[in-house]
Amino acid sequence: MGILQDLEFRGLINQQTDAEGLEQLLEKESVKLYCGFDPTADSLHIGHMLPVLMLRRFQLAGHQPIALVGGGTGMIGDPSGKKAERTLNTKDTVAYYTESIKNQLSNFLEFENVDNPATMANNYDWLGNLDVISFLRDIGKNFGLNYMLAKDTVASRLETGISFTEFSYMILQSYDFLNLYQHHNCRLQIGGSDQWGNITAGLELIRKSEEDAKAYGLTIPLVTKSDGTKFGKTEGGAIWLDPEKTTPYEFYQFWINTDDRDVVKYLKYFTFLSHEEILELEKQVAEAPEKRAAQKALGAEMTKLVHGEEALEQAIKISAALFSGSVAELTASEIEQGFKDVPSVERTAEDTVLIDLLVESKISPSKRQAREDVTNGAIYVNGERTQALDYVVTEKDRIEGKFTIIRRGKKKYFLIRY
């Protein structure tokens, strides 16, 4: 099965130019393709996952991906999908973001020791020294104003306003494609569905600049959720690929909590499971949704892919401990991950009567309530129910000398930090 057939099965093709010509080219030779990533933060988030994994899919199929980091365009701002003007970052900030993103991309693509190595490019290398006269004479003259105004990315902003800076973004991205076509023989650009206007503008520039040019564009669908909320966002904000911003446990939980209506679609979009494995999981969703086999597979595949096997095992262990209440077996680093958003209080490492600890840490509102909670068996210290009114929290209750986990009732956790 060819790469395009696999993408069709997975629902990963939104629009493409000259489908027949592209299919013939991909069957005939190892093709260079690119996708651009503008450095707007110091980490990629899961909204970037689909295009990153598309590059990986093409590489696994024998083609040569170019990961283009927009050190130049990142200083301008892409108006695509934006209702208002972006805040421009400083040159130093963009350079820092660029380096961070380059490091992350290297986790997904093979840059050496393979027959079809991926390459990394930074468009600042050719845009940074581009002078205004050359830009207007050699590139700008190929773009009719009516043509640009008709593009969705621009048309959608005409009423609210768009600066000349962002208006020019399409021309710069088009020049990227031309540059990569001329200097790297890059024949295909891929991107999100909101990039269709920019991609086709690039193809038009190549057509006008190069005789008998054969270049192609392909977009992937916008990832949606059945409940109408935005994919990749939670109450806590974006889901980042950087483990310092989103812990592997939080990352795993994001996928595990996928709606039954979306899980098969996400297995197709994001994982490298075979068609047969996905169809089997689809069957399990229909026959035994309560077992959440598809969600577990999705969570495992994605966490392993982004954070590695060890981080996945930790995430599963934390999830199981929180579900069962057996938290004493967790290490300090696992507690740090799993209890990141739990109310916590700093205390000195000294022996304290449990009743006093509950009140002083504001777990119970009063001593009377604290005594009642303990007597009624509502208080757990590191997962163990504690009903003795004179119980003293000592060194043995401090996990690795750093934490004591208090639970009140079935699910209300509190973290004591030392």
Curated annotation (Swiss-Prot):
Catalysed reaction, written as an equation: tRNA(Tyr) + L-tyrosine + ATP = L-tyrosyl-tRNA(Tyr) + AMP + diphosphate + H(+)
Chain positions of motif 'KMSKS' region: 230-234
GO cellular component, one term: cytosol
Subcellular localization(s) per the UniProt record: Cytoplasm
InterPro entries given in the database record: aa-tRNA-synth_I_CS, aa-tRNA-synth_Ic, Rossmann-like_a/b/a_fold, S4_RNA-bd, S4_RNA-bd_sf, SYY-like_C, Tyr-tRNA-ligase, Tyr-tRNA-ligase_bac-type
Binding-site residues for ATP, renumbered to this chain: 233
Alphabetically ordered keywords of this record: Aminoacyl-tRNA synthetase, ATP-binding, Cytoplasm, Ligase, Nucleotide-binding, Protein biosynthesis, RNA-binding
Keyword Phosphoprotein set for record: no
The UniProt record lists the keyword Nucleotide-binding: yes
Record CDD domains: S4, Tyr_Trp_RS_core
Superkingdom classification of source: Bacteria
Gene Ontology terms for molecular function: ATP binding; RNA binding; tyrosine-tRNA ligase activity
EC nos: 6.1.1.1
Motif position, 'HIGH' region: 39-48
SUPFAM superfamilies in the cross-refs: Alpha-L RNA-binding motif, Nucleotidylyl transferase
GO biological process: tyrosyl-tRNA aminoacylation
Domain S4 RNA-binding: 352-418
Residues that coordinate or bind L-tyrosine: 34, 169, 173
NCBIfam families associated with the record: tyrS
Function of the molecule: Catalyzes the attachment of tyrosine to tRNA(Tyr) in a two-step reaction: tyrosine is first activated by ATP to form Tyr-AMP and then transferred to the acceptor end of tRNA(Tyr).
Subunit structure as annotated in this protein's UniProt entry: Homodimer.
Family that this chain belongs to: Belongs to the class-I aminoacyl-tRNA synthetase family. TyrS type 1 subfamily.
Name under which the protein is recorded: Tyrosine--tRNA ligase 1
